[in-house]
């Protein structure tokens, strides 16, 4: 299906003249333009043909369709699509004149014009326009003779009718950044612009800005997602898994049943297919009442069912369609009749995205299963090009430490999604779940690459939680709500346990329920020993967190690590101020020097590590703004070091030394020269940092020894609060990016 998100109409009088049009178009396509229309009313036939050939070479190379403005002979010769206006050849005649495989777009200025062309096509038995340009939205200098503007509301009304008849639509006339967001909510399939890009200093940047606003405006708070698939009584696959996945991805799930499947975690024992008229009745009940923002197709089973669903998708309005070509269950059981493959190939031309596993991709291509991920991508390239549909390549069926995914576009370009393999035998329904989550994110307005990034990350955590579910005695399901529950726990506003308990009647702090491991860096005396003995619960939570486990084994995503490094750069700036304050308040010269030296190191040695990572080209942007978690921690440190007793401030800054050193030494056992985060592991297990930590422990011991009982208890509670802030600081990287 053609992506009409950003439709560029050229103008030879903008951007420096006709000779610059091809360069502007190429730049604009690189910025995100998805369709190009060559318009040059004044050019003679030969000149127009030359310009069309030049643009065709650019568009073909970059995988973007090219429409020609009302030049049928040139379009037929060069195999280009055509756009016509109300004053050009009547649409029915145009459709009969142009070869059927070429698209025709039509300008629509009023509702009467739209209803007339639909009626004319129905009477003549002619296919409806492939796309209609609705407008003008407002008056525009590029078409001074344009009819009266219809406004955003007029576009919305016509877009609803067009969508109901399966006609794509774009808003035209006076479209730009000022109204792109409003137009994105009208139901049109894209924005059609001229001067907004042709006259821009940077066409690529102008295209990116328009596309960003368009995509943001298209996002639905809770997309309505329809799954059309078979069932799984044990809940791990089929529509049961789809509905869980849709909910987890933020959608409202609806379901139409194609087959009642008797299956569990061991396999399939029977399939019952309801009558075809009942499938029609189910589909009618949904499409006649509810706007469908996305469709996920799963098990269709039989050739007639595949063709039946294909017919519905061709004639009813809906958002993006994601096809999971369910042919073989994880258990090895066949879920598609042998004669249905041809019908499925036809369906693949109708959908937006197809998500086969490795064996299914091989069947679709008529080849042997790919032995490697690279080979699978090449298979997908051939299939995507032949069918014109985006393919998701999934590495889960391969072997090795990686289970990467990829988006393969019809033009052959690839978007890779890194994904560490999860060691589990409980993977029932992963294909259903990934495609349903993908459909939901796309239904919310996210492009397929961002949608796959999200769905891959989500499914990886769902797989990591699968073993704990204990559903069935075979290959069990994934934990669809693992992320949801983790984020709910993180959002809990209940006061931290050590603050609710208060200080003990004897001693300065209560030991943790979880025994603290023997520290690699020993306490400097009884007070720091008591602090360490209270650390076990928090330290255990930190070591068990997904962030620290991924940091240790190298599977932490690049995005999560860079978020952490970015926030740590903000943290160190404020932490150095807290240390400098302690230097000014320290009771003796050695402590003053040590705190001051530590403050300087924060903004030199360690900050250099962060600048190195952030400037390696690994981050799209430099240091951003501090997160709420980072601000809470740094504000806490600044307040404790400035406003409380010296001993309290000293206790507050200690966990950043001691916990980091202990964690760094534990993770160092997994370090190796090829480790993606070897610099970080080297730094926090290195002799320099460890020596500084030993001195900090000694300074806190001395401060505690010189303080009174009440000060000691406040300092101990402050130390534990800082430990919890450390846990939150590490964990925040795995909480961002889920919206």
Swiss-Prot record:
Kindly state which reaction or reactions the protein catalyses.
Answer: 2-[(2R,5Z)-2-carboxy-4-methylthiazol-5(2H)-ylidene]ethyl phosphate + 4-amino-2-methyl-5-(diphosphooxymethyl)pyrimidine + 2 H(+) = thiamine phosphate + CO2 + diphosphate; 2-(2-carboxy-4-methylthiazol-5-yl)ethyl phosphate + 4-amino-2-methyl-5-(diphosphooxymethyl)pyrimidine + 2 H(+) = thiamine phosphate + CO2 + diphosphate; 4-methyl-5-(2-phosphooxyethyl)-thiazole + 4-amino-2-methyl-5-(diphosphooxymethyl)pyrimidine + H(+) = thiamine phosphate + diphosphate; 4-amino-5-hydroxymethyl-2-methylpyrimidine + ATP = 4-amino-2-methyl-5-(phosphooxymethyl)pyrimidine + ADP + H(+)
Residues at which 2-[(2R,5Z)-2-carboxy-4-methylthiazol-5(2H)-ylidene]ethyl phosphate binds: 140-142, 174, 194-195
Pathway(s) where this gene product acts: Cofactor biosynthesis; thiamine diphosphate biosynthesis; 4-amino-2-methyl-5-diphosphomethylpyrimidine from 5-amino-1-(5-phospho-D-ribosyl)imidazole: step 3/3; Cofactor biosynthesis; thiamine diphosphate biosynthesis; thiamine phosphate from 4-amino-2-methyl-5-diphosphomethylpyrimidine and 4-methyl-5-(2-phosphoethyl)-thiazole: step 1/1
Q: Where is the signal peptide?
A: none
Q: How is the cofactor bound?
A: Binds 1 Mg(2+) ion per subunit.
Q: What's a single GO MF annotation on this record?
A: thiamine-phosphate diphosphorylase activity
EC number assigned by the record? 2.5.1.3, 2.7.1.49, 2.7.4.7
Under the heading InterPro entries, the entry gives: Aldolase_TIM (IPR013785), Haem_Oase-like_multi-hlx (IPR016084), HMP/HMP-P_kinase_dom (IPR004399), PM/HMP-P_kinase-1 (IPR013749), Ribokinase-like (IPR029056), Thiaminase-2/PQQC (IPR004305), ThiamineP_synth_sf (IPR036206), ThiamineP_synth_TenI (IPR022998)
Instruction: Give me the residues that bind 4-amino-2-methyl-5-(diphosphooxymethyl)pyrimidine, please.
Output: 37-41, 69, 107, 143
What biological-process terms (Gene Ontology) are attached?
thiamine biosynthetic process; thiamine diphosphate biosynthetic process
Spans annotated as Thiaminase-2: 527-739
- Enzyme's top EC category: transferase
Which residue ranges are recorded for the region named Thiamine-phosphate synthase?
Answer: 1-210
Q: Which residues bind 4-amino-5-hydroxymethyl-2-methylpyrimidine?
A: 263
Region of interest (Hydroxymethylpyrimidine/phosphomethylpyrimidine kinase), residue spans: 226-481
Gene Ontology cellular-component terms for this entry are: cytosol
UniProt cofactor(s):
Mg(2+)
* Stored SUPFAM superfamilies: Heme oxygenase-like, Ribokinase-like, Thiamin phosphate synthase
| Family as reported in the entry's similarity comment | In the N-terminal section; belongs to the thiamine-phosphate synthase family. In the central section; belongs to the ThiD family.
Q: What else is known?
A: There is also a ThiE protein in this bacteria (AC Q8FP55).
Q: What does this protein do?
A: Condenses 4-methyl-5-(beta-hydroxyethyl)thiazole monophosphate (THZ-P) and 2-methyl-4-amino-5-hydroxymethyl pyrimidine pyrophosphate (HMP-PP) to form thiamine monophosphate (TMP). Catalyzes the phosphorylation of hydroxymethylpyrimidine phosphate (HMP-P) to HMP-PP, and of HMP to HMP-P.
HAMAP family from the UniProt entry: TMP_synthase
In Swiss-Prot or TrEMBL terms, this protein is called: Thiamine biosynthesis multifunctional protein ThiED
């Amino acid at each position: 299906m053609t992506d009409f998100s950003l439709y560029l109409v050229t103008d030879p009088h903008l951007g420096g003249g006709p000779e610059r049009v091809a360069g502007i178009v190429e730049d604009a396509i690189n910025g995100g333009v998805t369709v190009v229309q060559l318009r040059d009313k004044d050019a003679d036939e030969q000149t127009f043909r030359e310009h069309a050939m030049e643009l065709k070479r650019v568009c073909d190379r970059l995988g973007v369709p090219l429409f020609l403005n009302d030049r049928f002979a040139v379009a037929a010769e060069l195999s280009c699509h055509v756009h016509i206006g109300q004053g050009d050849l009547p649409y029915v005649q145009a459709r009969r004149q142009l070869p059927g495989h070429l698209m025709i777009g039509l300008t629509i200025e009023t509702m009467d014009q739209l209803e007339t062309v639909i009626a004319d096509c129905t009477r003549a038995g002619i296919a409806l326009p492939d796309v209609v340009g609705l407008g003008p939205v407002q008056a525009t200098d590029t078409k001074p003779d344009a009819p009266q503007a219809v406004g955003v509301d007029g576009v919305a009304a016509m877009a609803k009718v067009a969508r109901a008849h399966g006609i794509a639509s774009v808003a035209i006339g006076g479209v730009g950044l000022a109204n792109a967001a409003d137009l994105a909510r009208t139901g049109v399939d894209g924005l059609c612009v001229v001067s907004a890009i042709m006259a821009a200093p940077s066409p690529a940047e102008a295209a990116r800005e328009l596309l960003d606003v368009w995509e943001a405006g298209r996002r639905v708070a809770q997309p309505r997602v329809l799954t059309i698939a078979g069932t799984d009584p044990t809940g791990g696959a089929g529509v049961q898994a789809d509905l869980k996945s849709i909910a987890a991805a933020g959608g409202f799930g609806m379901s139409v049943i194609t087959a009642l499947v008797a299956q569990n975690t061991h396999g399939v024992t029977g399939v019952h297919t309801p009558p075809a008229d009942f499938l029609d009745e189910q589909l009618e009940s949904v499409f006649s009442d509810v706007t469908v923002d996305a469709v996920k197709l799963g098990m269709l089973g039989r050739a007639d069912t595949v063709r039946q669903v294909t017919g519905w998708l061709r004639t009813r309005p809906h958002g993006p369609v994601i096809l999971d070509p369910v042919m073989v269950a994880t258990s090895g059981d066949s879920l598609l009749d042998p004669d249905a493959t041809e019908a499925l190939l036809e369906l693949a031309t109708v959908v937006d995205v197809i998500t086969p596993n490795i064996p299914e991709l091989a069947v679709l291509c008529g080849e042997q299963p790919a032995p490697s991920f690279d080979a699978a991508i090449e298979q997908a390239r051939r299939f995507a090009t032949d069918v014109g549909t985006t393919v998701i390549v999934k590495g889960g069926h391969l072997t090795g430490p990686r289970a990467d995914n990829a988006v393969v576009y019809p033009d052959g370009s690839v978007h890779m999604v890194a994904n560490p393999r999860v060691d589990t035998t409980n993977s029932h329904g992963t294909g259903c779940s990934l495609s349903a989550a993908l459909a939901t994110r796309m239904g919310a307005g996210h492009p397929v690459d961002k949608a796959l990034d999200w769905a891959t990350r989500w499914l990886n955590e769902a797989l990591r939680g699968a073993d704990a579910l204990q559903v069935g005695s075979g290959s069990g399901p994934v934990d669809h709500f693992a992320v949801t529950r983790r984020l709910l726990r993180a959002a809990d506003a209940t006061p931290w346990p050590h603050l609710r308990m208060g200080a003990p009647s004897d001693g300065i702090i209560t030991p943790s329920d979880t025994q603290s491991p023997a520290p690699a860096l020993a306490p400097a005396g009884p007070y720091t020993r008591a602090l360490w003995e209270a650390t076990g619960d928090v330290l255990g939570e930190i070591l068990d967190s997904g962030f620290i486990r991924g940091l240790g084994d190298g599977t932490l995503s690049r995005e999560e690590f860079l978020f952490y490094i970015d926030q740590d750069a903000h943290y160190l700036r404020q932490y150095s101020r807290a240390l400098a304050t302690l230097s000014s308040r320290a009771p003796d010269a050695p402590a003053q020097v040590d705190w001051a030296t530590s403050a300087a190191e924060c903004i030199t040695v360690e900050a250099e590590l962060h600048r190195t990572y952030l400037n390696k080209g690994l981050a799209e942007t430099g240091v951003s703004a501090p997160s709420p978690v980072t601000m809470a921690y740094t504000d806490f440190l600044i307040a404790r070091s400035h406003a409380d007793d010296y001993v309290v401030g000293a206790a507050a800054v200690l966990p950043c030394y001691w916990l980091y050193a202990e964690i760094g030494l534990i993770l160092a056992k997994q370090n190796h020269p090829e480790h993606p985060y070897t610099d970080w592991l080297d730094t926090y297990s290195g002799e320099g940092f460890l020596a500084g930590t030993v001195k900090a422990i000694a300074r806190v011991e001395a401060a505690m020894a010189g303080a009174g009982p009440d000060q000691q208890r406040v300092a101990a509670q402050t130390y534990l609060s800082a430990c919890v802030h450390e846990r939150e600081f590490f964990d925040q990287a795995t909480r961002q990016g889920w919206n």
